[in-house]
Amino acid sequence: MNVIETRALGKSYGSTRALRDCTLAIPDGHVVALVGPNGAGKSTFLNLAVGLATPSAGEVTVLGGLAAGSLPALDGIAFVAQDTPLFKNLSAADLIHMTRNLNLRFDQGYAEHRLGELGIDLEQKAGKMSGGQQAQLALTLALARRPQLLVLDEPMAMLDPLARHDFMATVMTAVADDGVSVVLSSHVLAELERVADYLVLVSRGRVQVAGEVNDLLATHRVLTGPAAQAGRHLQHWDVVHASCAAPLAEVLVRGYATCEPMPPGWDAHSLTLEELTLAYLREPDAAALPGPARTHSPGTKERTK
């Protein structure tokens, strides 16, 4: 089952195209890192998936084919946004009561127990809580709905490192205990690397990279060798990003197997998710998507083989 699937999805705000020609299938059972620069279309994509916006073109379905925003879809998805929208004048107990009345599957016992573990007073008003406590309260209310899919849009942006760690610990406990699928948008790449097993990179309103992290890392390598020899090799490699400053060239390639045997004086090194992501962000015309292989050299348009 795909928890989110899009076909030629697009969204425009007036003359501004926030998302264009997005075709993507995210399978269930993953913690998905949704990354990209500011204004790339990440929040637009998530808003379309959870039914807070309607497409200008194409379609989006969730949880195995349900129309995004439909009542069955809303019943199976929980969403936490960056600003942790809580009624600041209501206590945690009030918010639990309100959320329970709006959601038939709401697990009040879980919510109260979880907040107790976190040391959050049920009688304290949300507006009097720290940023970390507010984020944990919003996350607890979302998880108590017992969703199949948890969507998180920059929920840790305003949190300190300890609060971010505690927030992600709660998320990963839900993944381990309940099998929740997660789509998490964040700018903190090192943090995502510890938890994500699926990557979706959005750039300039389109999906640039999508796939399981292990597969992406296995098919990409950083090649290093004499800068003077780089030019003769680049045309034969599927190059994502190249830095050829003398004396040593550093080239990130896709389809590493096609580069073997390595030329004399060249070595191949594995890379991290952060290095992979940054390389594609530096080369927005490069892509790594399921389907036909694409070739690209920095400064040129990609082409499909």
Where are these regions (language model features)?
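Helix-to-loop junction immediately C-terminal to a conserved catalytic motif
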Residues: V50
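Catalytic Walker B motif of ABC-type/P-loop ATPase nucleotide-binding domains
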Residues: L150-E154, L159
